[in-house]
Regions:
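Hydrophobic packing positions in regular secondary-structure scaffolds
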Residues: 2-332
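Alpha-helical transmembrane segments in multi-pass membrane proteins
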Residues: 96, 352-360, 383, 387, ...
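Non-transmembrane, extramembrane segments of multi-pass ion/lipid transporters
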Residues: 309-345, 396-421
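Juxtamembrane "helix exit" motif at the C-terminal ends of alpha-helical transmembrane segments
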Residues: 357-374, 437-452
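Hydrophobic, small-residue-rich transmembrane alpha-helices and their short perimembrane loops
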Residues: 366, 379-398
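Membrane-water interface of transmembrane alpha-helices in multipass transporters/channels
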Residues: 369-383, 450-463
Length: 525
């Protein structure tokens, strides 16, 4: 059976399904909303959306290769035909991340309708993978009953993240209607400072005792595992103090009667609830942990941070550093490029561009100061862009390395002299190579290509090459030292990277250039 026949068979099977009632496990309040959203007028809109989706998918190679793949048009078709049971079946088979991506393709209203039709556990898993923008749209449309239901199904750390961005009144209502255990756990997490380890952790983990055997540990995992964030690492706790950790691998490879205290690792690395999230993520990266234990200031074990949350932190921090280095104001509310509004993009970019535009005044002042040199030696002007661009590129190279090194802990402000010594040597080599190549280029170009048009070509080659040599050294030193100085002073090294370095290096390179030109061509100037 070829691909086209498979597609026709799948379509025919769906066509043969009868119209189905809304699933019985959907609350009455939500059923009423769904009935309103699935009236005849709404169905016509759904048909239009489905036809547009089919046109887009007609040229999609992945869809052609997988006729049974769940697509936007197929999802809408099931909705139009009121085949709710089938819709639940096909969405259950999808990976949560893939289902979340598919839901985000739907418009806001259709996304809400489909989400309300999903099974609770399927909806909750997909919800965790959605973008902040899509999640906010759903949350804003939820009733309190739906919101409480979602919170109860979510892992506690994800639920706390969601509630952090909501108005205080809504949070209060939701917590009042939540179960006592959920309410107490969420209140604790919400009280930790933002960006601290406490706000990132979850208290849902597998708890073991030292006096247990491996067989008893497996029984404990079976009981606690459903609600635990991870079962790959279990924690041995006595009187709320962490005594050790034991991996699932160790349990599986041990005899059932083996005591836990014989196979647990008591050399435990922990972080405090007040530690910065980025520090925690770096520690997890350093030790290759999939989960990091968290203790309070008294040393009591309070929860764990899992690798998925650590990756999110590192991604956010990396994005923020890149934005700052590109002279863009970071925005916590921004999502993807297309998910961010035109106004937000402009608002992020304008402030730094204004600052840099005004700071370029210094470069203009330098140029004005040496105006006489342009009149006497107009050829000097043609080399200015190359000189400033090369110096700026050199500065950006080392500043990028320094910002990355500082972020990863590979370089510290105390390494100032070591970095200085290394960059002097590196920049001397780079400057010498660039200077020699450029000097040869200028001499050959203006001797043969522009033969007879310019005098003292050798002088120009010397001026530009020597200027380039010293400009490269200057740029490398400025680019390397500024981020270190910023870190030492408590400022963000990324801010001191590309934006300021380019301005400083441009002005200094021009001063060097014209001073060297004056020395070489002092009679002509």
């Amino acid at each position: 059976m070829d691909m086209e026949e498979k597609k026709l068979t799948a379509d025919a099977a769906e066509q043969a399904l009868p119209v189905q009632e809304l699933p019985a496990d959907i609350p009455a309040e939500v059923r009423q909303k769904l009935a309103e959203d699935l009236n005849e007028e709404a169905t016509e809109d759904l048909k239009q959306d489905m036809r547009e989706a089919e046109k887009e998918e007609a040229n999609d190679e992945e869809v052609k290769a997988n006729p049974e793949m769940l697509t936007k048009s197929r999802l809408l078709k099931l909705l139009i035909k009121k085949q709710y049971v089938k819709l639940r079946e096909v969405t259950e088979e999808e990976q949560p991340a893939d289902l979340a991506e598919l839901l985000e393709e739907l418009d806001e209203n259709n996304r809400l309708v489909v989400f309300r039709l999903l099974k609770k556990e399927v909806a909750t898993e997909a919800f965790a993978y959605m973008s902040d923008e899509a999640r906010d749209d759903l949350v804003n449309a939820f009733s309190d009953v739906e919101l409480v239901g979602a919170i109860e199904e979510m892992s506690l750390d994800d639920a706390a993240d969601l509630l952090e961005d909501m108005p205080a009144g809504v949070v209060k209502r939701v917590l009042e209607k939540s179960s006592k255990q959920t309410r107490e756990s969420l209140n604790k997490l919400l009280n930790y400072p933002e960006s601290s380890a406490g706000s990132l952790m979850t208290p849902e983990y597998v708890r073991l005792r030292e006096d247990m055997t491996v067989a008893q540990a497996f029984e404990a995992i079976r009981k606690q595992g459903e609600n635990a964030e991870t079962v790959y690492t279990c924690y041995v706790v006595e009187r709320n103090r962490l005594k050790g950790v034991v991996s699932a691998r160790s349990l599986l490879l041990s005899e059932p009667h083996t005591p836990i205290n014989e196979i647990m690792d008591d050399n435990v690395v922990t972080v405090k609830v007040t530690d910065d999230q980025e520090y925690v993520a770096r520690e997890m990266q350093r030790y290759d942990f999939t989960a990091m234990p968290v203790v309070d200031n008294e040393g009591m074990f309070v929860g764990i941070i899992t690798i998925d949350d650590a990756i999110d932190v590192l991604t956010d921090e990396s994005t923020e550093d890149m934005q700052k280095m590109a002279a863009i104001l970071p925005d916590d509310d921004a999502t993807t490029y297309f998910g961010t509004s035109v106004w937000t993009h402009a608002k992020q970019r304008i402030p730094w561009l204004l600052i840099l535009m005004l700071s370029a005044t210094f470069t203009g002042m330098v140029t004005t100061h040496y105006e006489e040199a342009f009149v006497s030696l107009p050829l000097l002007v043609s080399f200015m862009p190359m000189l400033m661009d090369t110096a700026g590129n050199c500065g950006n190279q080392i500043s990028t390395l320094m910002v990355r090194g500082l972020a990863l802990g590979e370089v510290e402000p105390s390494d100032f002299l070591r970095v200085l010594g290394k960059e002097v040597r590196v920049s001397a080599i780079v400057g010498a190579v660039l200077g020699l190549v450029n000097g040869l280029r200028i001499y050959l170009m203006y001797t043969f290509l522009y033969a007879g048009q310019y005098e003292n070509v050798l002088g120009y080659a010397v001026v530009v090459s020597v200027s380039l040599f010293f400009s490269v050294i200057l740029a490398k030193l400025v680019g390397g030292m500024l981020p270190l100085a910023a870190k030492k002073l408590g400022a963000d090294p990324a801010i001191m990277a590309t934006p300021f370095i380019t301005t400083i290096v441009d002005a200094c390179s021009l001063i060097l250039y014209f001073q060297i030109a004056q020395l070489v061509f002092k009679n002509m100037m």
